[in-house]
């Protein structure tokens, strides 16, 4: 472990300012600042060899730990009861993004792993989906950084223009919550977009609460998609006859599901009064700590990814991934608006 310590400490220390900057500029978010800081420090870093094993550990294992802890933010009971009404639109937008990504991959010849990362990032939950998918498909750090950067760009655009667009289209509060929850990629940007609407229309946290639940419902798609990709990736890269689900099954996704179940069961016991008030406060504080730790681990992993990123390669290969990201984002927005219009939601 000692040979990893230097790199882990470096990533931890660099993640601190990235996390703080993410608090000040939520539209950008800590993960993006983490990548930027990592890229800058990588240019300045000398005697890099002693940091490499720790940096690689942070970019892979810490990323998986972040996904596991993410499960403690998912109360499956609440999501199922409230989010089920948005399911048709969620399924349609996810399907649209993945189909668009697949078609464009063939038309403009984008590397498969970048296509997958941008496709799932656009359709599910931005950086968290990319974090969950990257280890499953063995994505390189350059590819992860590129996908995160593309998702970030369209998150910012969405947060800036969607509240005004919602007014132009005469969205109801319910309609805009559903639009923000399905058409904005990352949870932090969904929060920013929905909060902006609440501020403009003096609706307290009504739209924010609903949009967050829609977003968390989308997040559940991480589970089937990562499992499918694990099977697909294994069959592509090895002999089909030697294929074993047990060998390729991403265990961190199992722990993610387990964390979600633990959260759901504990919340149920709190609601029915089985658990005393003092214990319930402690449990909620622990879950809150895990959720915050998950966010910090993602930032720490993004710092490591930034440190491993070839900036020249990232810039030179940027046009096609941007085109893919725009097409996925635009198509998701159109489908969300169109289906709401057809279903009479707004």
UniProtKB/Swiss-Prot annotation:
Recorded topology in the membrane: Multi-pass membrane protein
Primary location group: membrane
Transmembrane stretches, start-end: 5-22, 27-49, 62-81, 86-108, 115-137, 147-169, 216-233, 248-270, 283-305, 315-337
Pfam families per record: Cons_hypoth698
GO cellular component, one term: plasma membrane
Top-level taxon: Bacteria
Keyword line: Cell membrane, Membrane, Transmembrane, Transmembrane helix
Subcellular compartments: Cell membrane
InterPro entries in the record: UPF0324_pro
Family as reported in the entry's similarity comment: Belongs to the UPF0324 family.
Name of this protein: UPF0324 membrane protein FN0533
